[in-house]
């Protein structure tokens, strides 16, 4: 899996950062899942390597405008292009009425169905939000001025590496049988020989996991959601010098984000949702924010618009 940052500013866009949105590209699939959709997100998609036709699911963290104002326009564009068979939208219960009202008021009729999933019950009861044979999604309540939710996408363990040389040495012809063996299945060849796929595969490979937490002040539920994740993307609206403001507005400082990564044993942290007050021309710069976080959690990276990173 990989993620592409489409917007990394908090509250309002700046000349270099759009408001919140992130695209997750699934492994071995053309599917893209979008996390938040601030104003201008579809313009950001057009400038990136993401194809809007690949978007199948959209996850919204909360109902503040910098996370949702881009949704009606994006959904309308997907309808006009005629390339969408349906979109699943996950988020707070208010999201359905917001989207339906915006589309109705602008006389927009989509050519594809929208499927809404309200996440409150899943988050409060720690229920799996989505699951198939390759992946599952969990969500958790965060701590913000309005209800907000973090999301975790976890790949299921993958089959071990297939030993092709061993199969070839036993004169097993390449083809669909290799796929069955790689899945650990027992197969019977045309000559009557029987093989157990487990004998040709190494140990299962642990699937990657990605966690997206914004908006929130430091939250124990974010720590629990991020446990042993490969990548945590966490908001860092404020510098540690502005900690009082973070508590007042229920946003995170760089130190809070880093502490979440440290306590959850996350492999890598990327900080995003930066306040526009921190620029290279001001007393505190984005580079300073990165250094603050790295003091607590060294494997921290600073998000910027159009950054793409592999989850590993």
Curated annotation (Swiss-Prot):
EC class of the enzyme, as a word: hydrolase
InterPro entries: Metallo-B-lactamas (IPR001279), RibonucZ/Hydroxyglut_hydro (IPR036866), RNase_Z/BN (IPR013471)
Catalytic activity: Endonucleolytic cleavage of RNA, removing extra 3' nucleotides from tRNA precursor, generating 3' termini of tRNAs. A 3'-hydroxy group is left at the tRNA terminus and a 5'-phosphoryl group is left at the trailer molecule
Cofactor: Zn(2+)
Record-listed Zn(2+) 2 binding positions: 66-67, 215, 273
Residue positions binding Zn(2+) 1: 62, 64, 144, 215
Any one GO molecular-function label of the UniProt entry: 3'-tRNA processing endoribonuclease activity
The protein's Enzyme Commission number: 3.1.26.11
Pfam families hit by this protein: Lactamase_B_2
Superkingdom assignment: Bacteria
Family indicated by similarity: Belongs to the RNase Z family.
Protein function: Zinc phosphodiesterase, which displays some tRNA 3'-processing endonuclease activity. Probably involved in tRNA maturation, by removing a 3'-trailer from precursor tRNA.
Protein name: Ribonuclease Z
Source organism (scientific name): Prochlorococcus marinus (strain MIT 9215)
Gene: rnz
């Amino acid at each position: 899996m990989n993620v592409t940052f489409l917007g990394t500013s908090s509250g309002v866009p700046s000349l270099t950062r759009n408001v919140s949105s992130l695209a997750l590209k699934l492994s071995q699939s053309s599917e893209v899942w979008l996390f938040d959709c601030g104003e201008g997100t579809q313009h950001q998609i057009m400038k990136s390597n993401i194809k809007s036709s690949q978007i199948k699911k959209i996850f919204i963290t909360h109902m503040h405008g910098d996370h949702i104002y881009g949704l009606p326009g994006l959904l309308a564009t997907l309808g006009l292009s005629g390339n969408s068979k349906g979109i699943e939208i996950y988020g707070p219960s208010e999201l359905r009425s917001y989207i339906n009202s915006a589309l109705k008021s602008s006389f927009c009729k989509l050519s594809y169905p929208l499927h809404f999933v309200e996440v409150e019950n899943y988050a409060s009861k720690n229920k799996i939000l989505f699951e198939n044979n390759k992946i599952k999604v969990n969500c958790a309540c965060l701590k913000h001025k309005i209800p907000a939710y973090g999301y975790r996408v976890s790949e299921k363990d993958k089959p071990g590496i297939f030993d092709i040389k061993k199969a070839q040495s036993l004169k097993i012809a390449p083809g669909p049988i290799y796929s069955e063996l790689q899945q650990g299945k027992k197969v019977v060849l045309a000559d009557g020989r029987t093989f157990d796929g487990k004998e040709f595969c190494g140990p299962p490979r642990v699937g990657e996991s990605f966690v997206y937490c914004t908006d929130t002040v430091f939250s124990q539920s974010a720590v629990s959601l991020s446990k042993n994740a490969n990548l945590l993307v966490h908001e860092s609206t404020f510098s540690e010098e502005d900690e009082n403001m973070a508590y007042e507005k229920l946003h995170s400082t760089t130190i809070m984000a880093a502490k979440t990564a440290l306590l959850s044993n996350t492999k890598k942290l990327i900080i995003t949702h930066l306040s526009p007050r921190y620029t290279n021309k001001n007393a505190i710069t984005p580079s300073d924010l990165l250094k603050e976080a790295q003091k607590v959690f060294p494997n921290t990276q600073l998000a910027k618009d159009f950054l793409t990173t592999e989850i590993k």
